[in-house]
């Protein structure tokens, strides 16, 4: 059994177009180092998967919470599809082992980079939608995401920057700073990278579609670091 057969068995779906599945796990760095193979990276699938994920999660929340206000549903959805959550979902189904990376990206630790894993999860959703349809996407989410919603994991949506400030300032006054490290992607699909620094020490890094989302993501990773020490 090769890795792609193993992956299909793991997720519980057979792909009619296995090349589409491979593309979902192909980082641009791999494409740059294998130009003769005529392979495609996963960026377009990520774009599609992002939209499919938002739609399916929105539909689930809409039906599960018929009396919930729009603003609260929006916050819940944002917490579900944010980078740290997507990384958690990707790790739960062991997606990192299947990612195709260039040698340089591999050496730089790309296989465990949060933004990369989040992108792979979205690109897989895009590929699954194209190959198997929306119903199979929902079936997959019923295994990976919806049980966490049912368990109430996202009912208390949190301002992570405020929570981090409360955690680190319990015992003493500290200086918390956020830096935007850069931005990537085309104008219609930009991603920003941010880090949070507490008293001169980098505690978390994250990325998001906006600078505010990137800072929230960095704060969430910092909280995870502090609470799992």
Curated annotation (Swiss-Prot):
Domain DRBM: from-to ranges: 159-228
Principal cellular location given in the protein's record: cytoplasm
Disulfide bridge partners, by residue number: none
Domain of life per record: Bacteria
Subcellular locations according to the entry: Cytoplasm
GO biological process, one term: tRNA processing
Active site (UniProt): 50, 122
Binding site for Mg(2+): 46, 119, 122
Reactions the enzyme catalyzes: Endonucleolytic cleavage to 5'-phosphomonoester
One Pfam family recorded for the sequence: dsrm
Domain RNase III: 4-133
EC number annotated for this UniProt entry: 3.1.26.3
Task performed by this protein: Digests double-stranded RNA. Involved in the processing of primary rRNA transcript to yield the immediate precursors to the large and small rRNAs (23S and 16S). Processes some mRNAs, and tRNAs when they are encoded in the rRNA operon. Processes pre-crRNA and tracrRNA of type II CRISPR loci if present in the organism.
HAMAP family for the chain: RNase_III (MF_00104)
Family that this chain belongs to: Belongs to the ribonuclease III family.
Protein name, as recorded: Ribonuclease 3
UniProt organism field: Listeria monocytogenes serotype 4a (strain HCC23)
Lineage of the species this protein comes from: Bacteria, Bacillati, Bacillota, Bacilli, Bacillales
């Amino acid at each position: 059994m090769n890795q792609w057969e193993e992956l299909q068995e793991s997720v519980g779906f057979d792909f009619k177009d296995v090349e589409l599945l491979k593309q979902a796990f192909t980082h641009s760095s791999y494409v740059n180092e294998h130009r003769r193979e005529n392979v495609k990276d996963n960026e377009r699938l990520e774009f599609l998967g992002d939209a499919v994920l938002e739609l399916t999660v929105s539909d689930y929340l809409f039906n599960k919470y018929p009396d919930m206000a729009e603003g609260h549903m929006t916050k819940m959805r944002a917490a579900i599809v944010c980078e740290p959550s997507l990384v958690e979902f990707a790790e739960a189904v062991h997606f990192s082992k299947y990612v195709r990376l260039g040698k340089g990206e591999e050496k730089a630790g790309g296989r465990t980079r949060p933004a990369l894993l989040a992108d792979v999860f979205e690109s897989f959703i895009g590929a699954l939608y194209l190959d198997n349809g929306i119903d199979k996407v929902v079936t997959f989410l019923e295994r990976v995401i919806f049980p966490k919603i049912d368990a109430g994991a996202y009912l208390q949506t949190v301002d992570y920057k405020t929570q981090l400030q409360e955690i680190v300032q319990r015992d003493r006054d500290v200086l918390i700073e956020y830096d935007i490290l850069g931005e990537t992607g085309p104008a219609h699909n930009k991603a920003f990278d941010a880090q949070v620094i507490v008293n001169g020490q980098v505690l978390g890094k994250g990325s998001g579609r906006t600078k505010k989302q990137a800072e929230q993501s960095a704060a969430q990773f910092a909280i995870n670091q502090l609470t799992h020490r």
